[in-house]
Amino acid sequence: MQPIRYRTDLTPYNTFGLHAQARAFIALKHADELRDIVRLPEFDRDTVLWLGGGSNILLMQDYDGLVVHMENKGIREIARSDGMVLIEAQAGEIWHDFVLHTVALGLSGLENLSLIPGTVGASPVQNIGAYGVEAKDVIHSVRCFDLDTETFVTLSNADCRFAYRESLFKQEGKGRYVIVSVVFALKTHFVPNLGYGDLAAKVAELSAGREATAKDVSDAVSAIRNSKLPDPKVLGNVGSFFKNPVVSAEKAATLLQRHPDMPRYPQPDGSVKLAAGWLIDQCRLKGFQIGGAAVHDKQALVLVNKNNASANDVRQLAQHIKFTVFARFQVELHAEPNWLPTSFSL
């Protein structure tokens, strides 16, 4: 087990680059270390922060508790049959590196999720998604450490109760399950999913007349994301700041009467998903800035740390966007990242 560090600067551990310190900090290198970590005097189940890539958190103040940084690594094939491969990745693996690894192995299923920041362990929590694919579509099972019983358990896809940007790990299982690895069910035969946005055109450009591959899709997604989204290493951000709101069919119809060009995505249950970035853009908020926090000038869905932003700058900017969008469309936006502590949530 790694030594505990005290008063640790968390700026390098959150992609928005907010300044905060942890009262205590420890790096986890192997899942088995959890049995020892939960017995540390600094460990408090109610306050411990399990930290991955820090790409989905907003540190609003110093963290008065133990931070466990998940650094366990490893990828292995578990089984292969009937055109399907089960492959397990440890929670500390960098997500995009893992996606590229599976593509290089000739496996299909994760290519649409290329370049999403964060670690493998975060993928089930948020049920990450992009370009028509969600993590739930490819997750077979999730291996966790159950803090109730202090044993390792395996949860099936159904056990995880996935929904849009939701899962068991954000609801009833929050504070109980520590994700240590994820098993993905991937295909050996490439079946492209190109029905979202301008992905098909970019893939056609890259494949140049030949039959497209999973690598073409991964490269296309990466190129599109790089053209629209800032690199958090250069300009701090947490990716998409707001969830795409889901409204009733009646509400969507009313909005369409006033905004016939409004992007909308009908859902299986009859509701309609709207594009949060389009709503924000219609309010002419690109480039809008409060203190050091700003709406990105190319992608309205992304808030950036433009100039040493404070936590209060970020909160005020997010509030302004929520109020402005609601005033114009009567649609409520909800933030994707987790506010820490949660009392700061909008």
UniProtKB/Swiss-Prot annotation:
Report the GO molecular function annotations.
FAD binding; UDP-N-acetylmuramate dehydrogenase activity
Q: Which GO terms describe its biological process?
A: cell division; cell wall organization; peptidoglycan biosynthetic process; regulation of cell shape
Please give the cofactor(s) recorded in the UniProt entry for this protein. Answer: FAD
The residues covered by the FAD-binding PCMH-type domain are: 18-189
Question: What EC class is this?
Answer: oxidoreductase
Q: Which family does it belong to?
A: Belongs to the MurB family.
What's this protein's name? UDP-N-acetylenolpyruvoylglucosamine reductase
Native organism is: Neisseria gonorrhoeae (strain ATCC 700825 / FA 1090)
List the top taxonomic levels of the source: Bacteria, Pseudomonadati, Pseudomonadota, Betaproteobacteria, Neisseriales
